[in-house]
Regions:
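Alpha-helical scaffold domains
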Residues: 1-215
Length: 215
């Protein structure tokens, strides 16, 4: 029997729900008005991912439980793939991805899997793959392969474009010299978004921000 979460115990829900729903108009689920931080805390107390889905927070909770469970990547992959249709909002992809537990012995297998997953026809699943790569696999050795996947994307999905822009800005923060060449190769709108994210970031030096004008 699915677990029904009582979100009513959390304070200030109405205000938070309105705010979340403005940020996630694409979600078919209304917000319960509970922060992602609180959802993550709750996920640590529940092992069963059979959650009754009534609110966006229920979706986040289910995904975080699946992602954070300590098990082999082969086991986790099956459960993740069953969850992919529930990536109905950027908040779902971006909340689940950072919590993903991958055993050290499975890192290479997982990396190859998510590299391939960037090609998924569903834009939200593809976004999830890019966010996972950004958070778990971005190194000086992997950046070229990851960015080559990014420049290959042709999409009308604003949320996928924004996800790739976020990835690109993260690459530029950590590896500006290696990332610079990719701005001109990206979809024009993605490149524009990525540059703006870099300009807005306090982690990009003034010199690196100036360099963006020539990219």
């Amino acid at each position: 029997m699915a677990i029904k979460i009582d979100w009513s115990i959390y304070p200030d829900r109405e205000r938070k729900a309105k705010f979340t729903q403005k940020l996630t108009p694409e979600s078919p689920y209304k917000s319960a008005g509970v922060s992602v931080i609180e959802v993550k805390k709750l996920a640590k107390t529940i092992n069963d991912d059979d959650i009754e889905l009534n609110y966006l927070e229920d979706v986040l909770l289910k995904g975080i439980i699946i992602a954070s469970r300590k098990e082999s990547f082969a086991e986790k992959r099956k459960k993740l793939e069953a969850f992919y249709p529930l990536f109905i909002s950027w908040m779902a992809t971006d909340s689940v991805a950072p919590t993903l537990y991958i055993p050290k012995k499975d890192k290479k297998e997982a990396y190859r899997y998510f590299i391939k997953l960037t090609e998924d026809k569903d834009p939200m699943t593809s976004r999830f793959a890019f966010v996972v790569l950004m958070g778990h696999f971005l190194t000086e050795e992997s950046i070229d392969e990851i960015m080559n996947k990014a420049i290959a994307i042709k999409t009308d999905s604003y949320l996928l474009k924004m996800g790739i822009a976020w990835l690109t800005s993260s690459c530029y923060i950590h590896y500006p010299e290696k990332t610079s060449k990719y701005f001109s190769l990206l979809d024009k709108e993605i490149s524009k978004m990525a540059k703006q994210k870099c300009r807005d970031s306090k982690r990009v030096s003034p010199e690196a921000k100036k360099s963006l004008h020539n990219l």
